[in-house]
Amino acid sequence: MKKRLDEQREHWEKTFAENPDLFGAGPSEAGRLAADLIRAENRTEVLEFGGGQGRDALFLARNGFRVRVLDYSERAVEAIAAMARRLRLSGAVDALRHDLRDPLPFADESFDACYSHMLFCMALTTAELEFAFAEARRVLRPNGLHIYTVRTTEDPHCGAGIFRGEGMYEVDGFVVHFFGREKVARLAAGDEIVRFFEFEEGDLPRRLFFVAMRKSGIPGTSG
């Protein structure tokens, strides 16, 4: 699977080069809702996984948040940094290249919230996802929020294309990991799920879960 994710990186690099506005210029609806949830708790320090072309990271920065944004595509990181400079947001946005399979380069309890939009749908095994979620939990402050979206097993593309194991299918060269409710519960690892709902996005449309979890006091408990 490591080789497959490495191949996916090359595919995304090419995609970003050919279509710099692939996901549109404005923020995602998930990004807007995440901002509302984080702001309601008077939190400001956000870590975004898989920033892509930066639309949500830049939106968060424009709305008063301090954002560290990670992506495994060098082209994506460069594009986010360039856009932040153009918008005079460099002081609020720090873009870094990072592979989610590696430990996060931050100290424990560094952030108020972690956020990602469809990042966990990449070609990651369940074990790799569990590692990534544990790392997110490690860098969250007490009662911090982990907000993410994933495509569901009810998505029109689930079951299409080439089966790659563990709920993953390759469609048009992209490997997508589809989530059922059981996987969402498993990855929560006892943390409180404070928001959970299904929604649609795009022309297909994609069917997604929106999940917001609160870091509990003790790993593996819900208290």
Please give the residue ranges for each predicted region.
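Class I (Rossmann-like) S-adenosyl-L-methionine-dependent methyltransferase catalytic domain
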Residues: M1-E41, V46-L47, G52-D102, F131, ...
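A short acidic, Gly/Pro-enriched loop at the edge of an enzyme's catalytic core
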Residues: R101-C114
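Active-site micro-motifs of SAM-dependent methyltransferase domains
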Residues: D102, C121-M122
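A short beta-strand submotif of the Rossmann-like class I SAM-dependent methyltransferase core
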Residues: S116-L119
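Short glycine-rich, flexible loops that bind phosphorylated cofactors or substrates
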Residues: M122-A123, D155
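A short, conserved alpha-helix within the catalytic core of class I
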Residues: A123-E135
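Short glycine-dipeptide loop
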Residues: L140-H146
